[in-house]
């Protein structure tokens, strides 16, 4: 038996490339949820908001998704830099939507943590850190720059500044925790998976040599 027929041990890896389809599906879910939310607030609750601008931002995300799917194909494996740029786009799109609908006063501001979570579990540390940093910057900008929260036309709701600072602090804590702890847990899990795969291949190779 020649050495060419023997299985080769895998090289250790700290991350595995994401499939484009994974981010595309998550983005479609975001598009559907954002569309339903905006239309329900505007027409269902009767709260005025900049509807055309909100729908334009949501449409931009949909067009981005369609373009990526046709250009690269759903099974394309994304390099870490490209995956990080896509998550950065998602953060900026969500940040723009939140800026039009109340900033951090909007209860859906918590969704800023979603791209951070995806990056922490699937990207190398450097790219995951940059995505987390962008989320923190967007949250900080939204704390001071945003349109009023959609509410009853004859009422103007004003949140205490300390409360808004508390929301900002909780999001920043979430960003730090997810980017550090989740990334470390995912890294350890990948190392264990790599070690098990290497052990299985080594045993298989030994069996073939002794056959």
Regions found by a protein language model. Name each.
Residues 10, 16, 193-211:
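A conserved signal-transducing helical linker
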Residues 2-7, 67, 71-73, 166-202:
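Juxtamembrane or sensor-core-proximal signal-transducing alpha helices
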Residues 58-69:
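Central hydrophobic cores of alpha-helical transmembrane segments in multi-pass inner-membrane proteins
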Residues 14-29:
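N-terminal membrane topogenic signal
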Residues 20, 32-58, 74-85, 122-187:
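Alpha-helical transmembrane segments and their interfaces in multipass membrane proteins
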């Amino acid at each position: 038996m020649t050495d060419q027929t023997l299985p080769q041990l895998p090289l250790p890896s700290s991350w595995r490339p994401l499939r484009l389809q994974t981010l595309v599906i998550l983005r479609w879910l975001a598009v559907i949820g954002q569309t339903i939310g905006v239309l329900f607030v505007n027409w269902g609750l009767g709260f005025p908001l900049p509807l055309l601008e909100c729908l334009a931002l949501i449409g931009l995300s949909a067009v981005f998704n369609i373009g990526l799917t046709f250009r690269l194909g759903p099974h394309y494996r994304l390099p870490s830099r490209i995956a990080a740029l896509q998550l950065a786009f998602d953060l900026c799109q969500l940040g723009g939507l939140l800026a039009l609908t109340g900033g951090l006063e909007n209860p859906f501001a918590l969704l800023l943590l979603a791209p951070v979570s995806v990056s922490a579990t699937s990207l190398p540390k450097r790219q995951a850190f940059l995505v987390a940093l962008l989320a923190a910057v967007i949250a900080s900008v939204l704390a001071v720059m945003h349109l009023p929260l959609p509410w009853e036309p004859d009422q103007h709701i004003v949140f205490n500044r300390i409360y808004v600072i508390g929301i900002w602090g909780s999001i920043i804590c979430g960003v730090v925790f997810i980017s550090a702890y989740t990334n470390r847990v995912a890294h350890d899990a990948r190392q264990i998976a790599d070690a098990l795969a290497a052990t299985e291949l080594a045993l298989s190779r030994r069996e073939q040599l002794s056959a």
